[in-house]
Amino acid sequence: MISTLSQRLREHLAAVYGDAVSDGALDRWVDQLLNAAQLSAAQSPPPAHRNLWDETDVAVITYGDSLLHGEEAPLKTLHGFLTQRLGALVSWVHVLPFHPWTSDDGFAVLDYSSVNEALGTWSDITRLGVDYRLMADLVLNHCSSRSAWFENFRKGETPGDDYFFSPDATFDTSHVVRPRTSPLLNDVATQQGERAVWCTFSPDQVDFNFANPAVVVE
């Protein structure tokens, strides 16, 4: 029986990465992830299969700027609308991408550590989370081709030089099916020469390489 959060996390990572990560590296990885999440290794894991919502819950899904009111920050306007007009009728608020972005209505993230200034601040996000259960689109599968991490990939610098999936010419993509007309692999100029990067959605959305433990920790 898994009694601690660290044990459960270790089990999940071992199931995904198998022999690709040594036991010692796996233990260090678990510690890094728990520290990053500010969680205790001895903390009990959440109950399995516990529903976080039921038929009585009502969720609002919205972009950060779906509601505008003069010069007020859109996230403040959203909070005011929810608390004054909807109140306790709503239990969940799902905010679509609110980070700085370059394309695809927020789904090509430039910087995960900040809130788009055109929408508001982290305080506005926190305020929503105080009054409602908060959900957000973190967009963890890819980031903007103009992000600092991808610029570092091009320059061969850290962090970022090994954050992106860059298959070689022998990689078989013949079984990949995707509802897109843009190329799956895009060639980019780097310090090491031209390299192909995996772009599931668009050339501006470059996929992360989660085979690299550093990406998961980041």
Model region roles, listed by residue range:
Residues 2-217:
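Acidic/aromatic-lined carbohydrate-recognition and catalytic surfaces
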